[in-house]
Every structure is written in C-alpha cells, then in structure tokens.
C-alpha cells in the first residue's frame, strides 16, 4: 500500500486538522480513529489513521508556493507579454509618421487608442473573469492579443493602423486585471507585495523589450516584418503560460450581474478606490506623454537619432526594473502614501531635468521619471489589493480603466503641446499632471491611511 510520499506536513487553517502539502497544494488529509483496512473508495487507512486525497488520483497540477522562483518568473513573464506590444511603436514613431504621412496628433492617437482600448475593457474583463475564471481569461487574452499585431503590418492607412492598435489594447486587460485578481485570491497579503513587484518588473521589461526589439529589427528588416516577428513571439508566450500557470484553487464563480453591479456601486462610493483610480490616471498620463514625444524631440536637431538609437533610449526601463523591487521595502518601511509621494516627487525631478540639452542629462532625467512612475504604480496596485476585499477584480478593473484613460489623454494632450510648443510644452503638461497626482496623495490617500497620519 502506497501512502503519500515526499509530503510536507502542516496544520489546516483551523489549526486542528493535519494536512500534507505537495508543491504548495493540499495533497491529503489525515483522519484519526479509523479502523484498520479500507476506509472507503476515496481514502485508505492504516494503524488507526486514514489518508484521504484532496486531489483526484493521477491528476497533475502545476502549482507553486509564492516563494517559488518559477512561479514568480511566470508572473513577471505574463506582465512582460502584456506590455510588449502596447508601446512598441513608440520607438518607430518618426518612421511611421513618414510612412503614413501623418502629423503629430494622428501618430499620438495611434499610441493613445491602444491604452484607450485597455481602459474601456478593464471593468468588463473583471466581470467576465468573475464568471469564467482567471486562468482561462489570461490564456485566451494572450492568444487573441497576437492577431491584430500581425495584421497591423499590412495596414494601408494610418486610420486602419490606428484601429488595429485599438484592438491590441482590447485584449491586454485579460492579462493584467485577471492576473492581479488571481494573485489576490491565491495568496496571503504578506506575499502580494513581493509578487506585485515581480509583476511590475515584468511589465517594465516587456515595455522595454517591445520598443527595443521593434526599433532594432526595423533598422535591419523593416517595420512590417518586425511586427510579424513580435506577433509570433506573443503566440509562443501563450503556449508557455498555458503550460506553466497553475490553476486557480480559491476561485469561486460569481456570474450574477446583480452582484457585479452591487460591487460597482460600492466601489464608486469607496474613497480608496476612487483616489487610487485618479492617481493612476495621472501616472500613465505622464509615462505615455513623456516616452511618446521624447523620441520626436531626439529625432530632430541637434540629435538626429535613427530608429535603433531611439530604441536604445528605452533602456532606461531596465534601470527602472532593477530599482522597482525597492517598492516592497519602501512600502514596508514608509507605507503606501509616503511611498507614492516620494516616488512621484522623484518623477517630477526627472521631467525637469529632461529639459537639458546634453543627451546624457536627458537620459538621466528619463531614468528618474520612469523609476518614480514604476514605484508609484506598484504602490498603488498593492494599496488596492490590501484595502479592497470584495469585488477585487472589478476594483482592479476600475483602476486600470482610469489608468489607461490617463495614457490616452496623455498621448493626445502632449501631442497638441508638442505640435504647438515642442518639448517645452510637453514638459509643462507633464508637470501639471504630476502636481495633480501629488495633491490627490496628500488630500485623499494620506487621510485614509492611519499609518501615513501616524
């Protein structure tokens, strides 16, 4: 008779029922007082103990504890896939302007509609995942996400290209919103901050790699074939996530529309959710506005950078990826409100430095700006996950709706500013957005956090 081998014994949540775990999943339950011999079809007994499997015999479940490096890597990989295609065209905007004979506003809209699609779909994706499950939504979104990327290589006009970029954005929340809800359900609060840091690092790396790869590949083989290669890379990512992402263990389907509407009404009266959404709006406003139009500035005199050199500018994202895990330490030491305020102030300093003429100073300004934004985003997401217990995926969806709408507004308003006043106008617009974000932190978020007040 085979009993459970290589299992780690723990107490149950109630502290009375001993459980044995395998790969972080409860594998069997030990019951006392059973008679010798078979105790039934579902469990076997020996020496007064019965071992009842909690998983069907022969079922292989890919599951990892939150401390597993492989699971953290999977979380970061999904974040990278989500943002690899979203901003990739920023590195070739000057080329696209020439190819489609578009002006600054039209090309800015091609960037902005992607994040607009993300914002519009975020709340609805939250409702759908509440009904159908997190893992299914994540894998489906990655698959469909690769299709409009491939089709955009054949777009004949700037209008059709912009429409396809909008469709790219439609599928991104299926990865971002559902993954955050998945983590919030599957793990305890002490693990969420570290997992969120890995997720944000993944999004940072994905944002960098999409721009970097498209810029360099375009220099070698042209932008159309480069888009096809990036689409194939996303499809490969779909297969890897389908294989590696563990099934949900604590998900309970809640398909009722009435439940979702009650959660929506509750969130719309929740100062924590509303203030986080408002802050998220101005965070992505700044990031998209800055990195969409810094390339137009650097493609002009006196820099005249080509597409590969412009792609290299986004290496500042790698520095942000290295520094962003510090958000976990900052959150533990200072709390979310102080972390948000410090990181947003750092971003303001970076924007001001970007006005300098030497390319190295511009580069340093972009490092400070992006690092501040990444830490603010990580702190805000953790703030929502820790303070919202009911309708978490819908709350996350509302946050991302505001976050991505901010990116759309940033692309449009900064395009108008660049068209009228060049980079100085963009900097003025970004500083206004950052100052409003600081006002939200000190006037609302600070007041709702006892730790910040203390």
Model-derived segments and their meaning:
Residues 164-202:
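Cytoplasmic helix-loop-helix junction between adjacent transmembrane helices
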Residues 148, 159-167, 360-368:
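Paired small-residue
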């Amino acid at each position: 008779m085979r009993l459970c081998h290589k299992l780690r014994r723990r107490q149950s949540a109630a502290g009375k029922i001993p459980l044995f775990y395998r790969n972080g999943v409860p594998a069997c339950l030990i019951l006392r007082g059973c008679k010798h011999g078979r105790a039934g079809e579902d469990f076997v007994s020996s020496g007064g103990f019965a071992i009842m499997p909690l998983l069907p015999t022969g079922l292989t479940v890919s599951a990892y504890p939150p401390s597993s490096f492989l699971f953290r890597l999977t979380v970061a990989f999904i974040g990278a896939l989500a943002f690899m295609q979203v901003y990739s065209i920023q590195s070739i905007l000057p080329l696209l302007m020439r190819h489609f004979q578009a002006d600054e506003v039209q090309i800015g809209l091609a960037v902005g509609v992607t994040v607009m699609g993300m914002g519009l779909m975020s709340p609805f994706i939250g409702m759908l995942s509440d009904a159908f499950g997190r893992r299914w939504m994540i894998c489906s979104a990655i698959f469909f996400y690769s299709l409009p990327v491939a089709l955009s290589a054949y777009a004949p006009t700037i209008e059709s290209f912009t429409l396809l970029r909008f469709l790219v954005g439609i599928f991104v929340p299926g990865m971002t919103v559902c993954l955050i809800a998945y983590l919030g359900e599957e793990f305890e609060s002490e693990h969420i901050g570290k997992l969120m840091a890995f997720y944000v690092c993944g999004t940072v790396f994905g944002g960098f790699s999409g721009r970097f790869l498209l810029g360099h590949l375009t220099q070698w083989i042209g932008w159309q074939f480069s888009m096809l290669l990036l689409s194939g890379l996303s499809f490969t990512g779909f297969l890897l996530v389908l294989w590696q992402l563990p099934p949900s263990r604590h998900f309970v389907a809640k398909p009722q529309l009435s439940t979702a509407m009650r959660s929506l009404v509750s969130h719309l009266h929740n100062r924590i959710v509303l203030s986080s959404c408002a802050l998220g709006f101005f965070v992505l406003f700044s990031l998209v506005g800055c990195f969409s139009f810094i390339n137009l500035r650097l493609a002009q005199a006196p820099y005249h950078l080509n597409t590969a050199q412009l792609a290299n500018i986004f290496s500042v994202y790698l520095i942000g990826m290295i520094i962003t895990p510090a958000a976990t330490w900052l959150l533990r030491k200072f709390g979310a409100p102080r972390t948000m305020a410090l990181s947003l102030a750092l971003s303001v300093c970076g924007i001001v430095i970007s006005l300098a003429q030497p390319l190295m100073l511009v580069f340093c300004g972009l490092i400070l700006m992006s690092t501040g934004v990444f830490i603010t985003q990580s702190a805000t997401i953790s703030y929502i996950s820790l303070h919202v217990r009911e309708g978490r995926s819908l709350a996350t969806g509302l946050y991302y709706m505001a976050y991505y709408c901010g990116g759309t507004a940033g692309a449009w308003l900064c395009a108008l500013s660049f068209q009228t006043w060049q980079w100085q106008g963009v900097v003025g617009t970004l500083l206004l957005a950052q100052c409003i974000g600081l006002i939200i932190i000190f006037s609302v978020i600070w007041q709702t956090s006892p730790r910040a007040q203390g």
